[in-house]
Amino acid sequence: MKLIGITGMPGSGKSAITKLAEKYKIIVVSMGDVVRYETSKQGLRLNPENVGNTAVKLREIHGKEAIAVPCLNYVNEKYKCEDFVIIEGIRSIYEVNYLKKHAELDVIAIHSSPKTRFERLSGRNREDDSNDWNTFVERDERELNFSIGSVISLADYMVVNEGNYMDFMNDLENTFKKVINVI
């Protein structure tokens, strides 16, 4: 099985990969879902502060690859017969190293400017998003403290998401085809 890791700052367009996954019938496992699940398990409301604090605490308690371990266990238990599995939302170079140590992994980074991402997040209707600039900046700083910048800069592939949606999806699909050797 080959893992396809998706990384990018919040609002960059990572979730667009699910549309391609449906088209190519590839499973998507979201690392963010693991953190949101752990936040809910603690009885906390899903908002940027609680979800962010949960991610920090999980890494403090279980190490810097704390989110990758349960994700990979889940993938190995449920999807070991699949050719490809997408892991969406890789945040840490430690997670990348852990996954590469235990599986074949290619990482696709999706990049958008802070202004573009803020506009997208402000229009999204997810509880852990913010439409306040200061909260947005705090979230970015927290993400960067997880070493997401290293993951993005060391990714195997990069897709920029600043233009229109169709151009982005075409670029993403072309990159995706390279990763799964369809081209």
From Swiss-Prot:
Signal sequence annotation: none
Nucleotide-binding listed as a keyword: yes
InterPro entries given in the database record: NTP_hydrolase-rel, P-loop_NTPase
UniProt entry keywords in alphabetical sequence: ATP-binding, Nucleotide-binding
Residues that hold ATP according to the record: G8, M9, P10, G11, S12, G13, K14, S15
Gene Ontology molecular function: ATP binding
Family: Belongs to the UPF0200 family.
PANTHER family: DEPHOSPHO-COA KINASE (PTHR41930:SF1), UPF0200 PROTEIN MJ1399 (PTHR41930)
Protein name per Swiss-Prot or TrEMBL: UPF0200 protein MmarC6_1392
Organism this protein belongs to: Methanococcus maripaludis (strain C6 / ATCC BAA-1332)
Phylogenetic classification of the source organism: Archaea, Methanobacteriati, Methanobacteriota, Methanomada group, Methanococci
